[in-house]
C-alpha cells in the first residue's frame, strides 16, 4: 500500500513541475513583451518629441533659400549656406518655435538660435514678440533709404523701450551691428536680417548689453538666425535627466540631487555674485528697465572660471513693452495677469482688467532662486546673516516706498557679504 502511494506521488511530481515551468515560461514571456513594449513606446515618444522640437534642417533650409535668392544677408550666411563651416550640434530646444543648438562656427563653439513657424500677431499668452509672416523678411522694402530705415528702427525702439532720450545712439549702434561685412554700408539684405532680429527681445538685449560681462557675445547672424558665444555649463546645476525619469522623481529628492551636483560653495558664491551683477545691468540701464520673467536655473550658466553667463534671455522683456500689453488684458483673478513664469501684476476686479505694475522686482526673484543654492553648504559663520539678507531680498515689492533705495542697499549688502567670504579662497 505504501509502495503504491509513493509511486503515485512520483507520477504526479513531473506533472506539477511541468505545469510550474509552463507558468514561469508564460510569466517570463509576458514581462519580456511588456519591457519591449514599454521600451519601444518610450523610444517612439522620445523620437517624436525630438523630431518636433529639433528642426535644425528645416531652419537651415528656410534661411539658406532666402540667402541664395538675395533676400537676406549677414556675417554668418556664407558659412552656413556655402562653405558649411557653421553647423548644428546637440539640440537644446524646448519649444518647436524656438530652435536652439550647440554649434561650431569655423572651429569656434557657439550657440545657434533660430525662429520657426510663428504667426504674425501678438499673443500675450505665449510671447511678447511679433512673429514671422508666411512671406518671410518683407521689411524694409526695396527702395528704402538708410534714413527711412533708421526712422523705422527708432519707432520700433520707442514702442518697445519708451521715449528714452538716447534712442538715436541705440539706432546708430544697431546700424553698426547690421553692417556684417564692415564695408560701411548696410545692404538691403542686411537691413532685412536686422529688422527681423530686432523683433526678438534677446537679440536687442545682447546688443544693448554687449559690453557687459554676463551677457553672451553675439558672434554673427543670417536672417533671424543668430550665433552667440558658447557657455560651458548651461545650468546652475550639473545634472540633467531624461524627462521619463523626471516623472518618477519626487520634487524634494530632485532638489537634493541638484545640490549634490553643484560647484564648491565659494564657486557658487561667485556665480551668485554674477547673477546679482546681471540684475544691476538690466535694472534701469541706459535704455530703460528690463524685467526677468523666467528666473530659473535652466536659463543661467557659467564658464570655466565660474563667471555667470546668461543662456536664455528670451523672457527678459522691456518694462514699457510689458506694461503696454498687459494693462488692458481681461482678468478674473491675479492668476490671469502673468507673463512667463514670474512677471505678475494684480487684477483690478472693478474693471476686470490687469494693472500695469509688476509686483515683484528682478532682485527678489533672483534671491528666491539663489536661496537654496547658496544656503546649502554655506559656511557656518555667515549662514545666519546670509539667510537673513536673502529673505529680506525676497520680500522686496515694487510698490514699496523707496523701493529703489532698498533695492540698491540689499543688493550691495549681499555682494559685500559674499565677496568678503570668498576673496582669499583659491576656489573663487
Curated annotation (Swiss-Prot):
Query: Which SMART domains would you find in this protein's record?
Result: PIP49_N (SM01299)
Question: Does the record bear Transmembrane helix in its keywords?
Answer: yes
State the tissue distribution. Ubiquitous.
InterPro entries for the chain = FAM69_kinase_dom, FAM69_N
Q: Which residues lie on this side of the membrane: Lumenal?
A: 49-428
PTM description: Among the many cysteines in the lumenal domain, most are probably involved in disulfide bonds.
The transmembrane segments are: 28-48
Membership in a protein family: Belongs to the DIPK family.
Which protein, by its recorded name, is this? Answer: Divergent protein kinase domain 1A
Give the originating organism. Answer: Mus musculus (Mouse)
The record's gene field reads Dipk1a
Amino acid at each position: 500500500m505504501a509502495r503504491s502511494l509513493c509511486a503515485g506521488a512520483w507520477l504526479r511530481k513531473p506533472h506539477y513541475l511541468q505545469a510550474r515551468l509552463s507558468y514561469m515560461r508564460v510569466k517570463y514571456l509576458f514581462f519580456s513583451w511588456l519591457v519591449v513594449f514599454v521600451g519601444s513606446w518610450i523610444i517612439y515618444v522620445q523620437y517624436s518629441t525630438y523630431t518636433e522640437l529639433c528642426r535644425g534642417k528645416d531652419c537651415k533650409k528656410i534661411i539658406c533659400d532666402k540667402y541664395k535668392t538675395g533676400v537676406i544677408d549677414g556675417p554668418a550666411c556664407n558659412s552656413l549656406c556655402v562653405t558649411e563651416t557653421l553647423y548644428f550640434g546637440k539640440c537644446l530646444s524646448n519649444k518647436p518655435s524656438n530652435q536652439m543648438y550647440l554649434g561650431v562656427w569655423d572651429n569656434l563653439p557657439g550657440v545657434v538660435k533660430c525662429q520657426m513657424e510663428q504667426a504674425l500677431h501678438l499673443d500675450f499668452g505665449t510671447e511678447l514678440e511679433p512673429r514671422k509672416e508666411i512671406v518671410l523678411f518683407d521689411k524694409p522694402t526695396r527702395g528704402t533709404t538708410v534714413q527711412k530705415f533708421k526712422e523705422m528702427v527708432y519707432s520700433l525702439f520707442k514702442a518697445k523701450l519708451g521715449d528714452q532720450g538716447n534712442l538715436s545712439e541705440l539706432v546708430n549702434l544697431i546700424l553698426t551691428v547690421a553692417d556684417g561685412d564692415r564695408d560701411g554700408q548696410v545692404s538691403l539684405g542686411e537691413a532685412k536680417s536686422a529688422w527681423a532680429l530686432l523683433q526678438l527681445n534677446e537679440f536687442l538685449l545682447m546688443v544693448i548689453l554687449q559690453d557687459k560681462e554676463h551677457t553672451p557675445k553675439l558672434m554673427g547672424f543670417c536672417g533671424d538666425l543668430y550665433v552667440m558665444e558658447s557657455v560651458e555649463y548651461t545650468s546652475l546645476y550639473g545634472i540633467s535627466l531624461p524627462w521619463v525619469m523626471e516623472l518618477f522623481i519626487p520634487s524634494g529628492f530632485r532638489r537634493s540631487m541638484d545640490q549634490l551636483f553643484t560647484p564648491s560653495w565659494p564657486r557658487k558664491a561667485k556665480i551668485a555674485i554674477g547673477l546679482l551683477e546681471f540684475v544691476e545691468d538690466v535694472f534701469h540701464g541706459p535704455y530703460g528697465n528690463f524685467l526677468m520673467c523666467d528666473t530659473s536655473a535652466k536659463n543661467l550658466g557659467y564658464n570655466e572660471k565660474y563667471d555667470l553667463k546668461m543662456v536664455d534671455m528670451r523672457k527678459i522683456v522691456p518694462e514699457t513693452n510689458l506694461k503696454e500689453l498687459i494693462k488692458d488684458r481681461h482678468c478674473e483673478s491675479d492668476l490671469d495677469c502673468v507673463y512667463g513664469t514670474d512677471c505678475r501684476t494684480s487684477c483690478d476686479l472693478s474693471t476686470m482688467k490687469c494693472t500695469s505694475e509688476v509686483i515683484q522686482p528682478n532682485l527678489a526673484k533672483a534671491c528666491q532662486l539663489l536661496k537654496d543654492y547658496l544656503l546649502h553648504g554655506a559656511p557656518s559663520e555667515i549662514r545666519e546673516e546670509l539667510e537673513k539678507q536673502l529673505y529680506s531680498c525676497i520680500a522686496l515689492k515694487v510698490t514699496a516706498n523707496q523701493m529703489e533705495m532698498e533695492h540698491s542697499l540689499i543688493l550691495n549688502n549681499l555682494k559685500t557679504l559674499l565677496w568678503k567670504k570668498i576673496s582669499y579662497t583659491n576656489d573663487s
